[in-house]
Amino acid sequence: MEENGVIQETGGAVLTDLQYAPFVMYLQSAPFVSTACMTRVNGPPQPSSRNLESRYLNQDSYESRVEIELRDSGFYHISQIGKLILHNALINALIERWRPETHTFHLPHGECTITLEDVAMIFGLPIDGMPVSGFTDSSTNGLENEFMTQFGIAPTGADHKGSGVKFTWLRTLKRRMQLDTALGRQMYIKIYLLLLFGTNLFCDKSRMTIHWKFLPLLRNFSDIRGFSWGSACLAHLYRALCQASRYDCKEVDGPLALLCIWAWERLPFLAPMRSYPSFPLACSWMFWRSQFHRYQKWTISHIMRLLDDIHADGFVWNPYSPAHIENIVVPNDILSIDSCGV
């Protein structure tokens, strides 16, 4: 909250008091549209005419024989997340509140956003380390050379679309990997991670391919856990939300599971019932659909009205405090992250 003009940060979430009137705010830039920015002179704002398509691909499974290598890569926690069912109306309603200028959701009592703490707790990803960056080569020659260097085989013309390698080819390659050597298990993990990137962390609107630009970062297996994959995941979500805020956008991509579960943890009046306490916290929401049938029928306009009428205490500042997750054992590698704030 903001007191005397000073923005306070609590529990990793940022909220600023904007002194809202009975309306939320007016949109200042023409390329963006948000029904949350409409006035409430004679009642609640009109529901949005947009209904962005959002699809979530469940991540691939892995062989138990590669668990040691998976832990060494830093992706073991997120690999435990099973099938997730997201809520399209919730995603759409949140996008209507997103402002690209500040990378925050604008609510009647201020602004809030998704933080690195949320990424660490919801996905169990490392948020410290080297930046996930590099040269983006979209050439076919570069793709073939990198795959030949790391796997001794490269996708043919039918196995990739431009710079995107098809999931079907990667899954076939993963099944054919020999796991009786350390090198074979490491190559298996690299393929598994490419699929994880394409289905969850860095997915695009194709839902069929993953850009091979991530592969050079996996070249040295011992360096993989040294990257701040959680930071890259969060940046990708910010970018996806900014693109979805445009008036001409018809579909939203990115790590939407992070968005949904962040809302369920921080805005409990928008959440179904948690299945069972587990880490990473995304695992706690895997079976909500079988327990809360009425929640499935919530519409965009209904959720927008709930957000419009939120009270000042409707946002949970410390959802990861011992009082909130007392039955969940947080692994030491997550607790030791300085910037996590748990």
Show the residue positions of the predicted features.
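Structural stabilizers in ordered domains
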Residues: 1-342
